[in-house]
């Protein structure tokens, strides 16, 4: 075994710009160097926000939350660089395609976005 984590997650890990990341079941984001597997940064500001799947878009990590916000996070620093409310309902799924990304809320409404 090369690496393991005790984090419990609903989503598969993401790898972006040399960072391996996990969103835990309680919405804490933990990242590790994809080369050495040492801790990189941890982000606890989204704990209990019921984050959606992580999605890569234009070099950022995107996540949706239970209040209908989408957050863009720098994968190298863990700093939230943008945030936008797109729904009054929980964002359940994010999908990125070329120059746009799509968010689906719990009422199955589809939002097409870009930045």
PLM features: what roles do these ranges have?
Residues 1-115:
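Extracytoplasmic/lumenal domain signature
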């Amino acid at each position: 075994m090369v690496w393991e984590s005790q984090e419990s997650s609903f989503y598969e890990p993401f790898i972006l710009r040399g960072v391996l990341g996990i969103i835990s079941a309680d919405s804490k984001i933990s990242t590790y160097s994809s080369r050495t597997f040492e801790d990189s940064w941890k982000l606890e500001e989204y704990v209990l926000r019921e984050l959606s799947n992580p999605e890569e878009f234009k070099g950022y990590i995107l996540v949706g939350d239970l209040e209908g916000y989408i957050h863009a996070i720098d994968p190298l620093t863990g700093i939230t660089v943008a945030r936008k409310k797109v729904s009054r309902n929980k964002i359940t799924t994010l999908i990125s395609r070329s120059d746009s990304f799509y968010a689906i809320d719990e009422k199955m409404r589809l939002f097409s976005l870009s930045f």
